[in-house]
UniProtKB/Swiss-Prot annotation:
One of its GO terms (molecular function) is toxin activity. Belongs to the nemertide family. Its main location: secreted. Coiled coil: none annotated. It comes from Ramphogordius pseudolacteus (Ribbon worm). This is Nemertide alpha-5.
Length: 31
């Protein structure tokens, strides 16, 4: 899934689809 490092992230297919304000971390959907 997605591990967000900020607020206001949206999840789609296991990843971040929006920048979390200052940073975001996208993992493979199977994690």
């Amino acid at each position: 899934g997605c591990i967000a490092t900020g607020s206001f992230c949206t999840l789609s297919k296991g990843c971040c689809t929006k920048n979390c304000g200052w940073n975001f971390h996208c993992n493979p959907p199977n994690q």
